[in-house]
Every structure is written in structure tokens, then in C-alpha cells.
Regions:
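N-terminal beta-strand-loop-alpha-helix module at the start
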Residues: 1-57
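General beta-strand structural signal in soluble alpha/beta enzymes
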Residues: 9, 28-30, 49, 65-66, ...
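Short beta-strand segments
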Residues: 8-10, 31, 94-96, 124-125, ...
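Non-catalytic positions within long, well-ordered alpha-helices that form the structural scaffold/packing
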Residues: 38-40, 84-87
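Long, charged alpha-helical interface segments
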Residues: 133-245
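Anionic-ligand-binding alpha/beta catalytic cores of soluble enzymes and soluble regulatory domains
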Residues: 92-141
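Short phosphate-binding loop-to-helix
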Residues: 64-85
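Structural motif
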Residues: 9-13, 97, 213-215
């Protein structure tokens, strides 16, 4: 059974790409992401944010969720919660990479949060997609790969997000790995490569991995090793006592 898809437009870089919205997908514009949906002629089902990065007018209506500027949850997490609470488990996220490095790191952290709750987020960057996988396997379909062209069109990198990731196997790539343990302080999985007309997989038995792959690839199929419970929580518009000034 296919997962409900949510496409989120954030306020970061789009690298000249035209986002693709699958039929039936939920569309959420997060703050300045509304500038992009308007420019593309895409109707957002929900608009959310404190609107500090929006350059056009703030819409009014029941589908606009205005957040305070001081809060614990960043706008992207709030958008993810809205999508999750409406049944989405696959999130395609544009404009969440590039620009401020702290925003980029936060976006990558949020893909790990999704993975650890049984969802998946794909962050679209400059010719690359970033995702996270937790206790699961990613399967990439075989396709033609040009071994002499731009290396980014075949590059795959794998990082441990959890303190350690156990039972990591990489199959069908230029450099294979079997039942290894990766840690988040030793970088061993950078710059692997997809091979021509060869299916590939990245598997982690226990732990969370961050994976980057070419945006020209079809999105991988995900097989989870167990059921996941819990959710992302309710929309939070408060500042915790630990952060209060």
C-alpha cells in the first residue's frame, strides 16, 4: 500500500528545479515557501509559519496557520506535524537546504525524526537528495548510469546519525559493505557510486543513517524491519521554560 505523500515548500534554495507534486498529494507552504508556490502557480492546502521570510502578502483563511516568532518548533517541523496529523508519512521537501547552515542542519535532523517514527523525508538540494533511514532498507532500482559524466549523477554517501548504526550493509554499489557498524564520529561512507544497470540497497538493522543520492534517481523503496509507534506530536506554539527569557 502506498504512503500518503505531503509536499512541503520551504523558504530556502530551489536551485532552479521545478518541484513535482504527485496527484493527490497534500501541499504545505512553510513561511517563505509560499512565495515559491505562488510563483509556480501551485495551490497550497495549508500555509504555516511566523512569516518572517515571506516577501508577499500573508493570506487569510482557515488554511493559514500563523505561528508566533518565538517558539521551540521551527516552521518546517510545524509543517511536518500538520502533514503527519493528516495522514502523510512520505514528505518531499523543497527549499529546506542551502542558505543558513543552521537551517540546513535542522532540516537534516528532522529527516531523522521522521525516520525514527516510521516516516520518511526527502530533502531536495543542488542535484542531490538527502534522506534518513532507521531500522530499514532503501532499495534503488537499476537504471542507466553514465560512468564518465558528472560524478554527482552517481554519487551516494552514507552517514551514521545515531551514535552508532549496527548491521549496515550496502549492496550493488561500487564499494560494498556487509553487516558493519558505523558511528557518528567516523566518516567512512562518503562518495560511493551507483553502477550502470544495477539495483542497489542500503540497509541498517539498528540505528539511523543519513543518506544522500542523486536527484536524478527515482525515490528508493523503503522496507522497515519492524512497526513504528508514536507520532510527531501536536502543533506547539510555545517556548519551553528552559529557553524562556
Amino acid at each position: 500500500m502506498s504512503e500518503q505523500t505531503c509536499v512541503i515548500f520551504a523558504a530556502g534554495e530551489y536551485y532552479g528545479d521545478t518541484p513535482i507534486v504527485p496527484s493527490g498529494a497534500l501541499v504545505i507552504a512553510a513561511d517563505g515557501g509560499l512565495d515559491h508556490t505562488r510563483a509556480l502557480g501551485i495551490e497550497a492546502d495549508f500555509v504555516i509559519g511566523d512569516f518572517d521570510s515571506l516577501t508577499s502578502s500573508v493570506p487569510h483563511g482557515s488554511n493559514t496557520l500563523r505561528l508566533p516568532s518565538q517558539k521551540d518548533d521551527p516552521d518546517l517541523l510545524s509543517a511536518l506535524k500538520v502533514g503527519w496529523n493528516r495522514g502523510a508519512r512520505q514528505f518531499r521537501i523543497y527549499g529546506a537546504l542551502g542558505g543558513r547552515i543552521d537551517h540546513t542542519i535542522a532540516s537534516i535532523q528532522l529527516t531523522a525524526l521522521l525516520a525514527q517514527h516510521g516516516g520518511v523525508g526527502f530533502l531536495y538540494g543542488d542535484g542531490m537528495i538527502v534522506t534518513a533511514v532507521s531500522d530499514a532498507r532503501l532499495d534503488f532500482a537499476a537504471r542507466h548510469v553514465d560512468s564518465t559524466g558528472d560524478a554527482r549523477a552517481r554519487m551516494v554517501s552514507v552517514f551514521a546519525h545515531s551514535s552508532d548504526a549496527q548491521g549496515v550493509s550496502e549492496r550493488g554499489l561500487k564499494y560494498e559493505l556487509t553487516d558493519a557498524t558505523l558511528t557518528n564520529t567516523i566518516v567512512q561512507g562518503v562518495s560511493n557510486e551507483l553502477l550502470d544497470e544495477r539495483a542497489a540497497s542500503i540497509d541498517v538493522r539498528q540505528g539511523t543513517l543519513i543518506v544522500t543520492f542523486p536527484s536524478s534517481e527515482s525515490l528508493p523503496r523503503i522496507t522497515r524491519h519492524h512497526a513504528f509507534t508514536g507520532d510527531l506530536g501536536a502543533l506547539d506554539t510555545t517556548v519551553s521554560s528552559a529557553l524562556a527569557v
